[in-house]
Amino acid sequence: MTYGQIKDQVLQLLNQYSVAGTMVANTYNNQQDYLNRIPNLVNDAVMEIATTVRRIPAFLTLSLDEDSGLAYEEFGDRIRFELPEDFYQFKTGDTLVTTNEGHVFHGNRYMIEGRKYLLIPKREFQRGHVYTITYYRYPKLLALPPAAEDELDNVPETHYAIPFYVAAYLVIHDDSFLYASFYNKYEDKLAKMTPDISAEAHPVSDVYATSLGDAYGDIYWT
């Protein structure tokens, strides 16, 4: 769905789209104030949905070969890969890491450092292999000001909830009943979305841990 479509639906919910078949002018009532606030509220909704009920899967490649995969450096007895800027969290519940030959990569010990780096023991890597990791990314937000034809990120079913979120926050200080009606509809649509179900792996203590970072865990996802 495009930003222009979202904006039109929001104005329709607020009865600010047309009067007697004539499009409402920007100077009418609160129209321009609404138009000014809609883009940021759309981005708020896109981010909330993508980090809760419908996360966005993506893939990254790890390799020790030059000009392939993420940037890396040797860091003690580990290899430190720089995570992409849109990294949110690892996806678990399926084959998280595979080689280019289709083998599951059992890292046994990994570490996330400052949500920016992934550290994996050197002994787990082989040159000539390419390792693929599935992760969840942050959504791409609308540029400000957005163009009417700008596409929203995430799957289409998430877009149909966004107008209700935006409309709710446009009236939150003026009409508590209308706010509740819109926000309840937004939550109802989220609740009916097909969940992205996966088994979760939790960080565990590493008895051989060094002082290198923040979180340790086993890569057991298969």
Question: What role is predicted for each listed range?
Answer:
Residues 1-222:
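Glycine-enriched, solvent-exposed interface loops adjoining structured elements
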